[in-house]
């Protein structure tokens, strides 16, 4: 399998963040907690985001220290390894309140990287 470049991982992160935002749009916690399909979908998206974040090189993570890379990766680890103890309130709060803001930061990273690509032509 060919090696993926950083932009591919960043676009994966954005795609799964968009999915989370769309899955939980116009939804309250009570509806979320009672909808097994949405809960599982959001958890899976967070797992993929966390895995993709681990592929972001150290120099980029250091350039954007305000982005919670470590926390996103850590959440993935907790979700993967604590399947009987998932804290759905934390999942909900992350999905509803944190992901939309963090997504903006990842969009900035992509814009910065794509700007560098254009300047190097």
Curated annotation (Swiss-Prot):
A motif (RX(4)HXY motif) lies at residues 76-83. Pfam families: HepT-like. The modification O-di-AMP-tyrosine is found at residue 83. Keywords: Hydrolase, Nuclease, Nucleotide-binding, Phosphoprotein, Toxin-antitoxin system. One of its GO terms (molecular function) is nucleotide binding. The active site is at 76, 81. Its EC number is 3.1.-.-. Modified by antitoxin MJ1215 or MJ1217; probably at least 2 successive AMPylation events occur on Tyr-83. It is an enzyme of class 3 (hydrolase). One of its GO terms (cellular component) is toxin-antitoxin complex. InterPro entries: HepT-like, HepT_RNase_toxin. Probable toxic component of a putative type VII toxin-antitoxin (TA) system, probably an RNase. Probably neutralized by antitoxin MJ1215 or MJ1217. Neutralization may be due to AMPylation by antitoxin. Homodimer, probably forms a complex with antitoxin MJ1215 or MJ1217. Belongs to the HepT RNase toxin family. This is Putative RNase MJ1216. It comes from Methanocaldococcus jannaschii (strain ATCC 43067 / DSM 2661 / JAL-1 / JCM 10045 / NBRC 100440).
